[in-house]
Amino acid sequence: MRLPRVRLFRSPLDACRDPVWVNYGVSIQIAPGELQWRLPIIVQIIPGVLFFFFMLFQPESPRWLVERERYDDAAKSLAYIARTDPSSPAVQHTLAEIRADFAGRPTLGLIAQFRQMGENKTIALRCIIPSVLTFFQQWSGTNAINYYAPEIFAALGIASTTASLFATGVYGVVKFVMTCIVLACVIESWGRKRTLVWGGLAQGLMMLWIGGYVAVHPDPSVVPATYVSLVAVYLYGVFFCLGWGFTPLVLGSEVAPGHLRPAVMALASGTTWLFTYVIAQATPSMLAHITWGTYVVFGVASVAMAAWVWIGVPETTGVPLEDVKWLFEDDLWVRCVEDAPGGRWLLGKRRALTIDELKNRAGARAAEKTGEGEPADEQFII
């Protein structure tokens, strides 16, 4: 859901939940024992309770309300987001688009939604992309650093436990600040593809640098290149937040078909947690057995996922949710490359049809079928 000329600010709550400073504080203030490891876990209850409390005052999703034919409430919800009146033209136009998107579609239960994911190739592709995005997000190595940063910093020369925890805390602050900047200033102005492509390439280079450093200098003693590698860890956090920190969640929810979005995002969320667990379990073994190869794996994965986005995912920035389906119609590869950095130069004069051109063509086809006494295809009903 997106109103014209309205930019939604996605909250960086997920970045705020990292208790790195709590870990640092208890390590220097509380003697080793059960309380020292229990307290950081207990503290995480606080943001969860606050999140639950404040969600009680949030309006329902306009699309959820439209699906249940509560149109007046949907208009109020849209107006709340846009900070305008429910009767304003922008709200009514967006509401009409949402209603049209649901027209002719029955309300599906969760199991039925999973069955409908293979309805056709286009729907299947739109359902797969969110899970692929979250799969790649985990293989970028972000949770390997989040969970094992003290060990990683120690391997890079910060031997003291307190110092490594402090360095981990600084890493968390860097990610939090960068997340706020990206959500406020970058994600809408740069677009989804640019942030994912440039962020993936940059974070991949940082991982490859760290892997190369550890391969050449396995001894944790400090040399001049050690400081460059420590900076590379922080730059990795910056570039991750720039691209693969939150953009996969935004892009995934946008490309998912509206009538299947709950099931699609449930599958994407399940993929996230499955591979979070896989990375958490695999990283210690990887660091112990392939050492520097661990960073190379994450670096190569980051470059690969940037390449996949470049060639296989269309740009959704500025496109209302109700029009995203048109991005997957006709010459999808051309559209994906055209939207990518440097893509227009590569394609030369070749261009994909615009959304308006696709709508007009679909309308003409529907009119022809109606004139011949045939029902218009559902996919061409706007």
Where are these regions (language model features)?
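Alpha-helical transmembrane bundle of multi-pass membrane proteins
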Residues: M1-Y80, F102-I382
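Short intracellular "coupling" helices and adjacent cytoplasmic loop segments at the cytosolic face
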Residues: Y80-T94
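Cytosol/matrix-facing amphipathic helices and coiled-coil assembly/linker segments
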Residues: A90-G104
